[in-house]
Amino acid sequence: MDGSGFEDAAARADPHQRGLISHCYRMLGSVTEAVEVARGNATYEAATRECLERATTRPLPTDLADASDDPQGKLQQRSEVLWLEPFPDDLADGNLVDLSLIAALQRMPADQRAAVILHDLEQWSPDRITNLLGPIDLPGARASLRPQPGHQINRPALAAAYRDAFEQYDVPAILTFFAADAIWEMPPFTSWFRGPRNIGRLISTHCPAKGPGDQVLVPLKANRQPAFAVYMRDPTDNIHRAFQLQVLTLTAAGIIHAIAFFDLSLFPTSQNS
């Protein structure tokens, strides 16, 4: 297993448009839409206008409801929702694209989102922003951003150990990597869960794996964060097929946030074990 459709998006994109694609992703929360808009527009002004015309807001489950206290209950999907998507590092420019920031930007009105992105990340002057967007209360827009999770750090050994525990389907070991207030969510399922105990009960109840070897985790690079394409063994033919794409937020306390994306368009049709 050596990649996914997620990485194919980077391969199909013009590398000279990396900055514009990253800008459009920060506006839209979708790598697919970002590539489309960047291909059709030569300037940041034109691309920003099209992003505003699309006026999409892509949420995560944490934006729609409170945490669930029933990790063993039935999971409900909302496939009609346009969910936030991860972003391949191969497309990223030098500015921030971490998922917590993108999710926070998606909660803002689109014009305020554009103003914050253009000023803080693209270094546009207030006059240039006003010429494009009209008057915007930039300090007020910036103040509306929710506080982000604890400071992210690079912990490759933790990510590797987490991968090994998942491939062994060792749930107690998996849970040792999560911070006490960790969040687990998995669009398009609307429920989300807080704390290692609930996360463990969720995995034990709903994960199709039965033992070691049922899951294979392929490391990816997404949103400048550790990520894994998870392939699950199909017991009918022993082929590992696309199951979910996990993006992790790591802090000194451990994994503070895990998002498991079940959008299978991010994967090839199947992978042989």
Task: Indicate residue ranges for each PLM-predicted region.
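A short, charge-rich alpha-helical start-of-domain segment used by transcription regulators
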Residues: M1-S22, S30-V35
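C-terminal and inter-domain tail/linker signature
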Residues: E7, A11, G29, D63-L75, ...
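Σ70-family region 2.3-2.4 aromatic/basic alpha-helix that recognizes the −10 promoter
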Residues: Q17, R39-G73
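Short, small-hydrophobic-rich alpha-helical interface motif
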Residues: L20, C24, A34-A47, I129, ...
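Short alpha-helical functional segments enriched in proximate histidine and acidic residues
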Residues: H23, M27, E50, R54, ...
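Acidic active-site catalytic centers that drive phospho-/nucleotidyl reactions
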Residues: E33-E36, E53, D120, D170
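Active-site micro-motifs of SAM-dependent methyltransferase domains
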Residues: R49, E53, Q123, W184
